[in-house]
């Protein structure tokens, strides 16, 4: 059995004499191990059908019917209702005959008689999603695409009727059936899941029921198998690839699907991929972004909210083409649309798609122009990982214990009282920084999970859990409190959000923030103003904000833009 924890964690638990380490994960929200079945509400055409599908799932679980027979039986019923086979299962068209001969399965009468709704766009895909456990979907990355997203991505292609279209992760065939004005023999689908392939074949025959054709749906590993597909060149490749489901690999599998799909595009061919928003800015995907902007034309990036049951990741759709790179691409967020510069992507440290407006770019350019120093020469420390918060943290102080702060107690400039206490014994802790970092006479601490930097000052030598990290800054000409003033400034929050777009405040990003050269008088002034905020326990100073805006020559209109962005 594959271990559920990393080897490093295993070593730490062994060091700490933790027993039944694998079982620790059963008390946590470990989706990869979940056997819970979740009804994907966003996949329904009519939410009134949810109780019907819930009843069906209970029936299937009680009877313990095999998935393949369940789905085959439901598909047979749909073919009957569409008039493509009769009540004796005799096919009326050769594609239905081919499908029935391919799958030597016996229909289940109880499923043939079940009162399925007749107004669902993809009933078979919906049944499959309802039957699969949360853990299965999480491990494979297989969450089927809601119809409203399918329609939006498939719409507007405008290719010829005989354009070759491929979905390399076709699932139930939702994207392919969206091209109902195309020749179905020119629509190709691939999936590694044989049940998904069977569903897609049923769905293709049902959608194009007035045409007699054999669905071009195939079961193989698109990334590793060498088949006739590799010899074809497609006018459109459209898909929702698995996110993070590449077994035994460090990279997300969608990266591999993207790279191979671009190789299979015809000259001028289009590509439309649904991707996690991490594609836009996470450092590990820098190589992929660089590959795209240097070799292909980015047409549009559309931003969606999280919309898959069981998935909290926001996502985007990428529209690109096999053409020379252009200077800009279109950004679509809700009803708003605006052009964004490819140059800004190329100029960023990690080649991120910041989806910047021209106003965003102008502000970032002003900040970069004044950069004289950064935080790269500073000292950094991680918060403590106890390995067992439940037993090692205390809710009240007791002899020998001391306060330990979390990210929740960090406010701009100051800390609220600690709510947890710890007996500090480094040998019994899973992760610690050096003592001299925790016990430094002065240090800054910041929230690890946040959409913008939030820093506080500590001069008590306090301990911090790993929801907070530590910075002892070294910026020439600046006191630690002056640095704190810059880090909590609206301008720096804006720079971080637009330059990195991450919900984690990472050292690698913070080290790139642009600090200016200042006079000793400026340092004294800012140090005193920040000290006043700390002592009075205030989180905001208009004096500091305006001073830093003036320092970077940020206009009143740009200040308003920054403040609206941060709201």
Put a short name on every predicted segment:
Residues 23-24, 28-206, 226, 281, ...:
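Class I S-adenosyl-L-methionine
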Residues 133, 194, 223, 243-244, ...:
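Short, solvent-exposed loop/turn segments at secondary-structure junctions
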Residues 164, 188, 236, 443-444:
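Structural motif
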Residues 215:
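Short, conserved active-site loop motifs that form the nucleotide-linked donor/cofactor pocket
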Residues 265, 362-525, 550:
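Polybasic, glycine- and aromatic-enriched phosphate-binding surface used to engage nucleic acids
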